[in-house]
Amino acid sequence: MALGWAIIGAGMHPHLKLAPAIGLTPDAELIAVLSRDQGRADAFAETHGAKAGYSKMDDLLADSRIDAVFVASPNSAHVGHTVQAAKAGKHVLSEKPMATSVDDALAMVQTCKANGVKLGLGFELRFHPAHLLAKDLVSLGKLGRIRLLQGHWGRGERGEPEHLPRSGLRGWWEDPETMGGGSVIMGLGVHVFDLV
């Protein structure tokens, strides 16, 4: 039986990466998506073959076909969405960063443990073949004693635009309060820290 997934957030990352990944995963099915805007939720669901679009978290969590949620909402909302989902008995995979404070991260862990559900973080770069090879080389001592690590972040590919065209609307990641502070560290640097 397939694991029923819901995506909390209907932005560009869920549209371009998360929903297609769920669709390509054996024994996984995209059941629903949550957006603050019902029309956007419905359009996302139709585009990605989900069974339902919701604009209210309580309605999504009441859907018994959903086993797990992928929290892809603004950073400041991760704790609330994770805690609600865990209390409803749903497993949680959260986008990075986990939370915007240590207290919020601890609340997420404690609530998931108390409700017997799994909590994971979406650090997909851990599974890139180059990163797995680097990890093996370090673990096997093939590179000697590591004294310094440097991380560089690149975007886009040669000959491709760095970013998708913008709509002109301000994104949540441009609002320090919604992003939860941290600026580039929370948005990109967290991947480098995770890999280290």
Predicted features and spans:
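Beta-loop-alpha module in the N-terminal Rossmann-like domain of NAD(P)-dependent dehydrogenases
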Residues: 51-111
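Rossmann-fold dehydrogenase core element
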Residues: 107-125, 145-149
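Hydrophobic residues in well-ordered beta-strands that form the structural core
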Residues: 14, 54, 93-94, 119-121, ...
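N-terminal Rossmann-like dinucleotide-binding module
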Residues: 1-48
